[in-house]
């Protein structure tokens, strides 16, 4: 998920790394499961002409920031941050936000949300609809989990000894 988002962001902003792509190259759409952007130069921004995005993310993800985690302009910017940026820039997206769900959304949508993924491809990619949709989902039987993490906690989760 990070690779797909990062590639589209680099292409959208005309970064040097993206210049290996043909000049008229454009991703038809991006499906991101618990992904984020990595930036060493402050807050990343998409333009309104970025590819439409389907963003899945759980609010209790301690592996990849749901919103953002940064120190001195270096950080990861997750699905909530990306959706807010695309809203400001009139970019097309569908943001599936799952309350109290952790990093399991890095894989489960590919099995459990096939209908939603196919509908996104039909509506946003094939038919070219320019929509901004946010679905906030909560399993009322699921236990509440932490939803705020420090940079140190993200590092500890990802780099256990």
Over which residues does each language-model region extend?
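Primarily recognizes the serine-hydrolase "nucleophile elbow" in alpha/beta-hydrolase
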Residues: 1-49
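Extracytoplasmic/secreted proteins, especially bacterial periplasmic and envelope-associated proteins
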Residues: 2-6, 26, 77-81, 112, ...
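Alpha/beta-hydrolase-fold catalytic nucleophile elbow
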Residues: 31-34, 56-57, 99
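Extracytoplasmic/secreted cell-surface and envelope-processing proteins
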Residues: 38-42, 63-65, 105-107
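Short beta-strand/loop motif that positions the catalytic acidic residue
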Residues: 49, 54-57, 61
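Acidic catalytic loop of the alpha/beta-hydrolase fold
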Residues: 60-65, 70-72, 103
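Gram-negative outer-membrane beta-barrel domains
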Residues: 62, 78-85, 89-94
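C-terminal catalytic histidine-bearing segment of alpha/beta-hydrolase fold enzymes
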Residues: 87-161
């Amino acid at each position: 998920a990070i690779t797909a988002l990062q590639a589209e962001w680099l292409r959208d902003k005309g970064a040097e790394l993206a210049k290996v792509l043909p000049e008229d190259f454009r991703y038809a759409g991006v499906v991101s499961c618990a992904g984020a952007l990595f930036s060493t130069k402050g807050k990343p921004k998409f333009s309104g002409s970025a590819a439409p995005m389907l963003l899945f993310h759980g609010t209790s993800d301690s592996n990849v920031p749901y919103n953002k985690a940064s120190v001195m302009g270096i950080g990861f910017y997750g699905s909530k941050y990306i959706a807010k940026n695309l809203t400001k820039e009139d970019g097309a997206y569908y943001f599936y936000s799952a309350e109290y769900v952790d990093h399991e959304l890095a894989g489960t949508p590919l099995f459990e949300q096939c209908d939603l993924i196919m509908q996104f491809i039909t509506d946003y990619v094939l038919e070219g609809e320019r929509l901004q949709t946010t679905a906030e989902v909560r399993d009322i039987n699921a236990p509440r989990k932490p939803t705020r993490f420090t940079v140190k906690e993200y590092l500890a989760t990802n780099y256990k000894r």
